[in-house]
Amino acid sequence: LLAGEVDALPIKGFDFGNSPWEIDQADLQDRELILRTTNGVVATLKAQDSKEVLVAGLVNAEATVNYLRQQNPPTVVLVASHPTGDEDVACAEYMRHLLGGEGVSYANARERTLNARAAKKFYDGTHPRLRPEDIEAAASSDGPGALIMRVRFDPIPCITAHPAPQD
């Protein structure tokens, strides 16, 4: 299956856009999904020399931070992959807050995500596959039980979802 977007718009001929709502409606059990995004994939590939790469958004930020606490790495680098998007910066700041540094609350990060410049096109109704539900999903949190998204690069870049470790 192919999923992806260019400047938030679904790619012609792909099975899905980068829509949490569309993906949530699909039966993906035992299916492989190839994802292409404007910024996230590029940022992930640039991090491939790191010891471990995790992908997070507000939906799995808390679970990802809990995983990082358990692993206790000497250094954590948070990358906001959208070059001008406040929603990615808000998520990184929220994760930094959860890690014990300066940052913002979940409520603040959620509000910034819902009101980000990039979110506006999901509310204006100009494209049938850009829905307000996608921004609501992106701004939601599944809490500590969310899936941890690990990236492996061998033999090819691949993100795999793992249950959050229990305390």
Regions found by a protein language model. Give the residues of each.
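Short beta-strand segments
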Residues: 3, 35-37, 56, 79-81
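Long, charged alpha-helical interface segments
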Residues: 15-32, 36-38, 46-47, 51-52, ...
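Nuclease catalytic cores that cleave nucleic-acid phosphodiester bonds
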Residues: 25-26, 42-45, 54-69
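Glycine-rich phosphate-binding loop signature in dinucleotide/nucleotide-binding domains
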Residues: 28, 71-74
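Residue-level preference for the first positions of well-ordered beta-strands
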Residues: 32, 75-77
